[in-house]
Amino acid sequence: MEEDERGKLFVGGLSWETTQENLSRYFCRFGDIIDCVVMKNNESGRSRGFGFVTFADPTNVNHVLQNGPHTLDGRTIDPKPCNPRTLQKPKKGGGYKVFLGGLPSNVTETDLRTFFNRYGKVTEVVIMYDQEKKKSRGFGFLSFEEESSVEHVTNERYINLNGKQVEIKKAEPRDGSGGQNSNNSTVGGAYGKLGNECSHWGPHHAPINMMQGQNGQMGGPPLNMPIGAPNMMPGYQGWGTSPQQQQYGYGNSGPGSYQGWGAPPGPQGPPPQWSNYAGPQQTQGYGGYDMYNSTSTGAPSGPSGGGSWNSWNMPPNSAGPTGAPGAGAGTATDMYSRAQAWATGGPSTTGPVGGMPRTGPGNSASKSGSEYDYGGYGSGYDYDYSNYVKQEGASNYGAGPRSAYGNDSSTQPPYATSQAV
């Protein structure tokens, strides 16, 4: 480590109102300061929620760490030594961190620290905030000094805090999930500089978005997965849908809550009317195919043939070579522009050649919505936060723009321990 870095201290969890002068005034009590900076967003000029303090005497860093917790401008701040080991790699197994979901809007970091001290020594508390609305987004993270404390608190799963039920899950970084993350971002420290919203911490049992591409976008249909299975990942924006339909969790209950590859938007269903953990099941498959209502006969006869394969305003797929629906054996183009041979007459149990397997009651390809583990909340986290609050017209949890925790001003506290100045 360079000599001028030995006395540098990273300070995270700063209030939006904390200035460089306030930060320097607070830490000067621990020793002479030779440099102090609050990191700001280049575009908006607003604080990013973290900064750096450099002491003339490096021993003052330990003095600060031994005299916590520290509170500045009404927030519990998080000072850490600024060195490569602490800033680049978290402890294996998640750093004894837990996720807290469904937090009351009036709970503070001090309240959480006081409450969870009964389970063991708390080393860090972070509540996610919406910078625009200046209020809690209803979830956060808490770190313990001992792993046994994490096991103890997660065994309860739910606790009652300020009259509201709060969910507790063990949090682990995505880089410990077998390298399945398709985003080219790295986890840096407890709150590293990331390419996605917040950090790559999520519940240890939740899978990575099955259809996630670069930068959190949907990357295409997963391999070896039947297309058109009902109740699968409802609410996600597909290929050809409008941004208004993009959701993270349960979608609208009407047809068209997600679209297929290149399919035009269907009719929009009613807005969600639920909170907590329940969501309506859906019976449509990808691309607007109504698999439960499909018949087992051969080629559909026109747009309404069979009443099934094209029920949600998709272009007819059943035209033969001459353009006449059901005009006998020939070829047609499916939703992927692949030529298909249509069979005439006689029952068919699989639909058109190259088509989707039949689903419905009694078929193994059909599952209920509750059997799927929805990996919501953008691509940074592996769980669905939209179930913690009642939505009103928008479904992304917290109603704030998606951003990288520590790289944008839309979340609180957006600081990144992997960036040294």
UniProtKB/Swiss-Prot annotation:
It is found in: Nucleus; Cytoplasm. PROSITE patterns: RRM (PS50102). Residues 240-250, 275-284, 406-421 have a biased composition (Polar residues). Disruption phenotype: Lethal due to developmental defects. The modification Phosphotyrosine is found at Y372. Keywords: Cytoplasm, Nucleus, Phosphoprotein, Repeat, Ribonucleoprotein, RNA-binding. Its main location: nucleus. Gene3D superfamilies: 3.30.70.330. Residues 293-302 have a biased composition (Low complexity). Residues 264-273 have a biased composition (Pro residues). Residues 171-191, 240-373, 392-421 are annotated as: Disordered. It comes from the Eukaryota. GO terms for molecular function: mRNA 3'-UTR binding; mRNA 5'-UTR binding; mRNA binding; poly(G) binding; single-stranded DNA binding; translation repressor activity. Interacts with sqd; the interaction is RNA-dependent and may be specific for sqd isoform A/sqdA. Interacts with otu; the interaction is RNA-independent. This is Heterogeneous nuclear ribonucleoprotein 27C. It comes from Drosophila melanogaster (Fruit fly). The gene is Hrb27C.
